[in-house]
Amino acid sequence: MPAAVIGGIATHYEVTGDGPPLLMFSPGGFSATLSNWTSLGIYARLRLVDHLARSYTCIMFDRRESGGSGGRVERITWPDYAAQGKGLLDHLGIPRAHLMGGCVGCSAVAVFAASWPDAAASMVLYSPAGGARYRITQQSRFAQHLSYYSERGGAAVVDLAQTSGQVFTKDPRLGPWASVIRADPAFADRYRHQDPAGYQTIVAGMARLLFDRDTVPGPEPEDLLRLQIPALIVPGQDASHATSAARYLEECLPRAQYWDVPVSGQTERTAPARVLEFLASAESQ
């Protein structure tokens, strides 16, 4: 798998298919890997990549601190996640692309479009993460990690990450840098010996700013209201992907199309066809 260094952090990515570029921000929360597009939940069932790659050049990547990508201990923000995707386009020499996000990737897509509107041909926002229960769950996850770190220290987190094979979403004690600890011995050593008070301040701020609302986190509504970029919104319907989050995006995006179909009606026959129909219409505008 090829890798690009973006903002000093290695990004593992994959390009498949042929046609106009489609930059895909992976689903999967704090384990947002490119493989999730073909192996995780609804995305595996719909086989979206198989269908999209027939008409588009699909550019997928492991989000920073996920999978084979690297990371850095800092107060990570949604603009940081969006900048990783923009940096990948720059690395590939692509000035403009369609954007697609699944789950948590929708937040990064919306921030990307608000930050670099000229680089965004359209947005597909599939099952956006958000909602009150989503916020509560995420903040609780960070609180559990901080409690474990405070009691046991960085060395215990490193030892746990290197022996458990789990990720932050499955075991909150690990924190959001577990995959980097596991893959990079030098990073693990720095993590083990970092300043505890400074680290806890970083993590507390990260949790507060990433998950600060009971809808789609990331983009500010005032920025979305000004975006003149075609968008297709496909709703989710569970504790992490509240339908209200999708409706919020519909309310805020002036050129939004809302595919009002329940998750049970989103099938391999219907969903890829709807996404392809939207992308084709955006191409013609």
Which residue stretches match the model-derived regions?
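Conserved HGGG/HGGXW glycine-rich cap/lid loop of the alpha/beta-hydrolase fold
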Residues: I6-G70
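Flexible "cap/lid" loop of the alpha/beta hydrolase fold
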Residues: A114-S115, A119-R152
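Gly/Ala-rich beta-loop-alpha elbow adjacent to hydrolase catalytic centers
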Residues: G101-V109
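Hydrophobic, aromatic-rich cap/lid helix
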Residues: A178-P219
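Conserved alpha/beta-hydrolase "acid-adjacent" motif
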Residues: A239-A245
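Catalytic active-site module of serine/aspartate enzymes centered on a nucleophile-bearing elbow/loop
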Residues: P254-Q285
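Conserved acidic catalytic loop of the alpha/beta-hydrolase fold
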Residues: P79-A97
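Short beta-strand/loop motif that positions the catalytic acidic residue
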Residues: R226-L227, I233-P235
